[in-house]
């Protein structure tokens, strides 16, 4: 355990050093809206808020959609960098809720309490698959999102996304990792649901060698307003990749038409979440 923690600390120190080495994003670089950042309790312990904010700034991440297990991490990072952080509420009190939250009554109480105390733009990111979307606790979560005017950030298969829309046809959903689906399936879902947007976090199949792969390129050009990039710092060590992910994203985005690249890099995130957060203040 101590050895693993030591490795994590070294990696996180490397994250800050790498970010500083890159320096602020050059004018020619695209700003990045990172739509998939977590700052959970173990990350807070290993990378204090001031250092985490420095990683984001030096990587040229001008805005980040942040959720955490538990929410205290998000609130600490928001207090440190309010010009960057846009908060969403993850329905997890601890990491243990990742797999069992859909059947844990205490999750509802937790979400209700946090919504009364703080402001958010979305509920998520949450893990939800298939028919579990129709269980009472996920249904209550959807009701709360509707009540508070929040988006849903779903780490879900297409089936669960469909079930969420059946419960709330007007829902606005950010589909985490684009469901890890192939581009043709993502296309089907985007065509069917005009309020569905997709993040590309924790996947690399959409680009290689500094260029989008052909099927994904077609999809990005067909739906330029519906995609966002994201790192997914689901464990503390992933913070090491925030600068590298931003750099890698800029490389393949620059192969797209400039207006499309700008939308996916940061304008879509600003239009969807930046605008929503401005209304909450």
Spans of features found by a protein language model:
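Di-metal (Zn2+ and/or Mg2+/Mn2+) metal-binding site signature of metallo-dependent hydrolases
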Residues: 31-45
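Bacterial N-terminal signal peptides
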Residues: 7-21
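Mid-to-C-terminal alpha-helical segments outside catalytic/metal-binding sites
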Residues: 5, 23-26, 30-33, 50-67, ...
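Active-site environment of divalent metal-dependent phosphoester hydrolases
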Residues: 40-42, 71-74, 94-96, 129-132, ...
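Catalytic pocket-lining loop regions of alpha/beta-barrel enzymes
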Residues: 89, 132-229, 276-281
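Active-site metal-binding loops of divalent metal-dependent hydrolases
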Residues: 37, 126, 178, 231-233
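Short, well-ordered coil/turn segments that N-cap beta-strands
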Residues: 29-31, 35, 60-64, 81-87, ...
